[in-house]
């Protein structure tokens, strides 16, 4: 019985310490390290204290296309795998757009995209212009900027 009390005391002492410990988070960016937002994400995740908080932080990121999380049981180890959205163009230096026209914040970190300026009401028009120019293989043309007006 005496040994049982000692064991219970050790568990009571160690449990709160383990509950408030920070997670060791291992992140794999499957699409590469492209955005300034990824640096901010790493910083935010480093300070997270719970599994729910880690998931909330990841779900808030509009530039993430998909992610998976693996938790090591009985350890504070987390493995996160992230697939980035691949931007096609930047509209008015405010938002990236991917091939599915999903809009996410532009953070000035990726500059080798088509820069679109102007009052665009339908983003599909821009994507069609880019697609048509890229599909013409007979011309050697590098599209870097579109000044859109109608």
Residues covered by each model-derived region:
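Charged, solvent-exposed interaction patches on well-folded alpha/beta domains
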Residues: 2, 19-51, 55-56, 60-150
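Sec-dependent N-terminal signal peptides
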Residues: 6-15
């Amino acid at each position: 019985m005496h040994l049982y009390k000692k064991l219970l005391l050790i568990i009571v002492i160690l449990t709160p310490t383990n509950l408030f410990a920070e997670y060791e988070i291992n992140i794999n960016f499957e699409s590469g390290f492209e955005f300034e937002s990824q640096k901010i994400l790493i910083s935010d995740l480093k300070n997270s204290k719970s599994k729910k908080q880690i998931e909330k932080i990841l779900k808030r990121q509009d530039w993430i296309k998909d992610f998976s999380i693996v938790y090591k049981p009985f350890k504070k180890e987390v493995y996160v795998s992230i697939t980035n959205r691949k931007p096609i163009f930047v509209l008015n230096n405010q938002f990236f757009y991917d091939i599915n026209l999903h809009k996410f914040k532009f953070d000035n970190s990726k500059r080798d995209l088509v820069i679109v300026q102007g009052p665009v009401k339908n983003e599909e028009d821009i994507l069609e212009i880019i697609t048509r120019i890229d599909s013409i293989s007979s011309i050697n043309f590098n599209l870097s900027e579109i000044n859109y007006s109608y």
